Amino acid sequence: MTCKIIGSGGYLPSKIVSNDELAKFVDTNDEWIRTRTGITQRHIAGDTEYTSHLALKSAEKAIADARVSVNDIDLIITCTTTPDNSFPSVASKLQGYLGLTNIPSFDLQAVCAGFVYGLQVANSLIASGKYKTVLLIGAEKMTSLLDWSDRSTCVLFGDGAGSVILQRSSDDSGLIDSNIFSSGADYEILYTNGGVSMNGISGKIVMQGQKLFRHAIEKMQQSIEDLLHANQFSVSDIDYFIPHQANIRIINKLAELLNIEEHKVVKTVEKHANCSAASIPLALSTLKASGKIKKGDILLFSAIGAGLTWGSALIRW
């Protein structure tokens, strides 16, 4: 028994900040950013536009795409590291926005790997037989965690949300398998220098870029190879590779090491920047909207985030 994606939707805030605009108040330039990251712009949420608002916009699109009633949803999981409040959860607020009552709703925090984590959790809960229609969301307002004087981090991130509707599969489509991992010993590679129990503030992003690059390549490659081997798949079986959209150099290097053909690699980092847990569902929504995916296609997701947390998932469309 496995779950399948029956609908998807993405939302990006209307405000777009190009590299040239960013260079007006940050010591950087368009060439420096593009060469190192592949990013040309990012979407930034307004001061009164919160993660729950982004989540709602993407959820409404996914519900419409799935052609289900909002009342069919019996579980909400929101993957985020930028909640509106310390409590309640974004998922709980979203439940209220959607007019739903008495269904379980909770947030999952695995940063950039959140959507892959959430997919495995949602699949397990659907497999239990207790839930039939799950709304799984990746939503982030990452710009709220940025130190705008630190050009090594502030140029990388954007805001956005992506959602999917999951139901139990009645055929061979759906989640084939997934794996998730963490390594707490490496937490200082990427973290925020604050937190509720630490100092009462959210803090700003601190990153050791070169170390993170090496870990990203190593851990995502191993995760993918293990997943393919465990399920007797080869790289040639993959129709679309949707990696976490953190940095074009990571994406390209990973595709090169795995021998994944260029036309199979989905890249949205140029326009979206790094939207953390939202990046994979946003990229999926973009791919689906292009009309390229067809029934039976094999999709490969893979992500790594702070924690360190990472994992991969294989899906038959």
UniProtKB/Swiss-Prot annotation:
ACP-binding: annotated segments: 245-249
Pathway: Lipid metabolism; fatty acid biosynthesis
Keyword Lipid metabolism: yes
CDD domains, per database record: KAS_III
Catalytic activity: malonyl-[ACP] + acetyl-CoA + H(+) = 3-oxobutanoyl-[ACP] + CO2 + CoA
Catalytic center residues: 112, 244, 274
Keyword ATP-binding: no
Domain of life per record: Bacteria
EC main group: transferase
NCBIfam families found in the cross-reference section: fabH, PRK09352.1
Quaternary structure (record): Homodimer.
Domains as described in the record: The last Arg residue of the ACP-binding site is essential for the weak association between ACP/AcpP and FabH.
Name under which the protein is recorded: Beta-ketoacyl-[acyl-carrier-protein] synthase III
Organism encoding this protein: Rickettsia felis (strain ATCC VR-1525 / URRWXCal2) (Rickettsia azadi)
Gene name of the record: fabH
